[in-house]
């Protein structure tokens, strides 16, 4: 289970599975290229490397290095700084050396390109900013942490669609006598 959902339900001594049915996906994304090549992107590292090797053997090592580097970004940007408010310039200034070391001045695409040579693989491995409305060519490489975040926790599907997550949260809130105001801005 995605830990944030589980953590929320645990606060109320409830099991998320009683409210929301999430199932881990085996294939996360399917990329179909102009030339007909298909890449099934997943959490299965052996399968990922095999598919990368079929496209460009030299990029397997680059992929492994990219994953290691995105773990460093994840450790800093998600694990360490996710709860830090950047409401004062000094707080941000203290993080500058770390952010520079993590190449935050590069775009996601530029970071990926420093490890991956094949253009198909570059586009595939730099697509993560699109998930949050960003442009891989201009979004800071800090968003590369999404690549590692997926590897750490996987990608899940809400059975019945995302609306069922809302329904499950609403049910929990009603049981906890939390006032809901609906139909208003």
What residues fall within each predicted segment?
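Residue-level preference for nonpolar/small residues embedded in alpha-helices
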Residues: 1, 62, 164-165
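N-terminal FAD cofactor-binding segment of flavoenzymes
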Residues: 1-28
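Alpha-helical scaffold segments in soluble metabolic enzymes
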Residues: 4-7, 51, 110-114, 168-171
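Residue-level detector of beta-strand face positions
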Residues: 30-32
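Rossmann-like flavin
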Residues: 34-139
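Helical element adjacent to the flavin cofactor pocket in flavoenzyme catalytic cores
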Residues: 103, 113, 145-185
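Active-site-adjacent bridging/hinge elements
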Residues: 140-144
């Amino acid at each position: 289970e995605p830990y944030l959902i589980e953590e929320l339900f645990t606060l109320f001594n409830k099991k998320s599975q009683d409210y929301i049915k999430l199932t881990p996906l085996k294939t996360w994304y399917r990329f179909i290229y102009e030339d007909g090549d298909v890449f099934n992107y997943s959490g299965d590292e052996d399968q990922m490397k095999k598919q990368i090797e079929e496209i460009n053997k030299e990029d397997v090592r680059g992929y492994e290095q990219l994953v290691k580097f995105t773990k460093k970004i994840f450790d800093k940007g998600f694990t360490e700084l996710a709860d830090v408010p950047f409401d004062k310039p000094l707080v941000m200034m203290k993080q500058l050396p770390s952010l520079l070391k993590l190449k935050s001045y590069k775009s996601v695409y530029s970071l990926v390109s420093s490890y991956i040579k094949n253009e198909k693989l570059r586009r595939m491995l730099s697509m993560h900013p699109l998930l949050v409305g960003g442009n891989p060519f201009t979004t800071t490489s800090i968003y590369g942490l999404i690549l590692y975040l997926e590897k750490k926790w996987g990608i899940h599907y809400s059975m019945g669609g995302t609306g069922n997550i809302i329904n499950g949260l609403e049910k929990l809130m009603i049981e906890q006598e939390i006032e809901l105001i609906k139909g208003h801005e």
